[in-house]
């Protein structure tokens, strides 16, 4: 995905910085199109950059960009909300942190940062040819990590984390409030309550757990029948509560809805007190065993509709799960659309299969990656042990 070269572990630890002066930016003597217009409008026409969409160059500004000074139009706003917290398998964000698109991306070399920037945004906002200079660097630090807040026309907003939260809460259609992202120096290891299914392997492969981690960092409970509020409070506090129904074909003496009700009960015990600013996340996964009535109850209890995450190989639907969660990007439109008919047929096929039932945790594994914006992680390279 990214064009920045891999960091050399033997090299001296240093960060390269490019600062661009106004003379470099004023090279646009005549207006171009799209993003090429931005520098011309600001330098030649003295237009306030807040009146220009810094994602595409449109003058039809809907609101202000949350991370950098400048406007953002309605279509780019929707794209930004939909893609900001999406991650690739390499652990870095899938799209440019400015425009939330871009084909060739430059990766920040700060090991605590997962952000990327497209060539087009860097050249139009920082200065022509800057992307090539960045690409040639051994270890480049990005515009949200630099000590200096300005690079060319790109000016980092003050308190951009709170600006991002306000932007998301105001503009997103998601009924749940977004938690403000946490600065690196304040991030703590995530504490997890894993119900029914053990997700230790997934969290370890993502770098959230390491060998020798505090045993209390992950609490796995299979039978929660006798678990009461006092137990959860003594085990906690928790930052993430995860639960799932058994997979199709799994022998179980309890109805599928039991897992939903028990998850919801323990979720209430684990929640921080009302008004607490502490980031708190949860996820419940249905492995296609809940019937329509159960699904309606789940959506009412969890206060949202589920998102279907499919596993498609060679154009064929191999597996799928339904997910309810308040983790950012779970509700992204980038998830492939799967019809209820396809899910019903898949469930029937898996139910009649004689293969051993497996927990399809790999389908939701990458859904945890946005938590890197909130909690400490111990590895910058994802392992593919699943």
UniProtKB/Swiss-Prot annotation:
<dbReference type="GO" id="GO:0141196">
    <property type="term" value="P:transposable element silencing by piRNA-mediated DNA methylation"/>
</dbReference>
<keyword id="KW-0539">Nucleus</keyword>
<dbReference type="InterPro" id="IPR011011">
    <property type="entry name" value="Znf_FYVE_PHD"/>
</dbReference>
<dbReference type="InterPro" id="IPR040552">
    <property type="entry name" value="DNMT3_ADD_GATA1-like"/>
</dbReference>
<dbReference type="InterPro" id="IPR029063">
    <property type="entry name" value="SAM-dependent_MTases_sf"/>
</dbReference>
<dbReference type="GO" id="GO:0035098">
    <property type="term" value="C:ESC/E(Z) complex"/>
</dbReference>
<protein>
    <recommendedName>
        <fullName>DNA (cytosine-5)-methyltransferase 3-like</fullName>
    </recommendedName>
</protein>
<dbReference type="GO" id="GO:0048863">
    <property type="term" value="P:stem cell differentiation"/>
</dbReference>
<dbReference type="GO" id="GO:0008047">
    <property type="term" value="F:enzyme activator activity"/>
</dbReference>
<dbReference type="GO" id="GO:0045814">
    <property type="term" value="P:negative regulation of gene expression, epigenetic"/>
</dbReference>
<keyword id="KW-0744">Spermatogenesis</keyword>
<dbReference type="GO" id="GO:0006346">
    <property type="term" value="P:DNA methylation-dependent constitutive heterochromatin formation"/>
</dbReference>
<keyword id="KW-0863">Zinc-finger</keyword>
<dbReference type="GO" id="GO:0005737">
    <property type="term" value="C:cytoplasm"/>
</dbReference>
<dbReference type="GO" id="GO:0001890">
    <property type="term" value="P:placenta development"/>
</dbReference>
<dbReference type="GO" id="GO:0007141">
    <property type="term" value="P:male meiosis I"/>
</dbReference>
<dbReference type="GO" id="GO:0071514">
    <property type="term" value="P:genomic imprinting"/>
</dbReference>
<feature type="zinc finger region" description="GATA-type; atypical">
    <location>
        <begin position="52"/>
        <end position="82"/>
    </location>
</feature>
<dbReference type="GO" id="GO:0009791">
    <property type="term" value="P:post-embryonic development"/>
</dbReference>
<keyword id="KW-0221">Differentiation</keyword>
<dbReference type="GO" id="GO:0007283">
    <property type="term" value="P:spermatogenesis"/>
</dbReference>
<dbReference type="GO" id="GO:0060718">
    <property type="term" value="P:chorionic trophoblast cell differentiation"/>
</dbReference>
<dbReference type="GO" id="GO:0090310">
    <property type="term" value="P:negative regulation of DNA methylation-dependent heterochromatin formation"/>
</dbReference>
<dbReference type="GO" id="GO:0008270">
    <property type="term" value="F:zinc ion binding"/>
</dbReference>
<dbReference type="InterPro" id="IPR013083">
    <property type="entry name" value="Znf_RING/FYVE/PHD"/>
</dbReference>
<dbReference type="GO" id="GO:0141005">
    <property type="term" value="P:transposable element silencing by heterochromatin formation"/>
</dbReference>
<dbReference type="InterPro" id="IPR025766">
    <property type="entry name" value="ADD"/>
</dbReference>
<dbReference type="GO" id="GO:0141068">
    <property type="term" value="P:autosome genomic imprinting"/>
</dbReference>
<dbReference type="GO" id="GO:0000792">
    <property type="term" value="C:heterochromatin"/>
</dbReference>
<dbReference type="GO" id="GO:1902494">
    <property type="term" value="C:catalytic complex"/>
</dbReference>
<dbReference type="GO" id="GO:0005829">
    <property type="term" value="C:cytosol"/>
</dbReference>
<feature type="domain" description="ADD">
    <location>
        <begin position="41"/>
        <end position="173"/>
    </location>
</feature>
<dbReference type="GO" id="GO:0045892">
    <property type="term" value="P:negative regulation of DNA-templated transcription"/>
</dbReference>
<dbReference type="Pfam" id="PF17980">
    <property type="entry name" value="ADD_DNMT3"/>
</dbReference>
<comment type="subunit">
    <text>Homodimer. Heterotetramer composed of 1 DNMT3A homodimer and 2 DNMT3L subunits (DNMT3L-DNMT3A-DNMT3A-DNMT3L). Interacts with histone H3 (via N-terminus); interaction is strongly inhibited by methylation at lysine 4 (H3K4me). Interacts with EZH2; the interaction is direct. Interacts with SPOCD1.</text>
</comment>
<dbReference type="Pfam" id="PF21255">
    <property type="entry name" value="DNMT3_ADD_GATA1-like"/>
</dbReference>
<dbReference type="GO" id="GO:0044027">
    <property type="term" value="P:negative regulation of gene expression via chromosomal CpG island methylation"/>
</dbReference>
<comment type="function">
    <text>Catalytically inactive regulatory factor of DNA methyltransferases that can either promote or inhibit DNA methylation depending on the context. Essential for the function of DNMT3A and DNMT3B: activates DNMT3A and DNMT3B by binding to their catalytic domain. Acts by accelerating the binding of DNA and S-adenosyl-L-methionine (AdoMet) to the methyltransferases and dissociates from the complex after DNA binding to the methyltransferases. Recognizes unmethylated histone H3 lysine 4 (H3K4me0) and induces de novo DNA methylation by recruitment or activation of DNMT3.</text>
</comment>
<keyword id="KW-0862">Zinc</keyword>
<dbReference type="GO" id="GO:0044726">
    <property type="term" value="P:epigenetic programing of female pronucleus"/>
</dbReference>
<keyword id="KW-0479">Metal-binding</keyword>
<dbReference type="GO" id="GO:0005634">
    <property type="term" value="C:nucleus"/>
</dbReference>
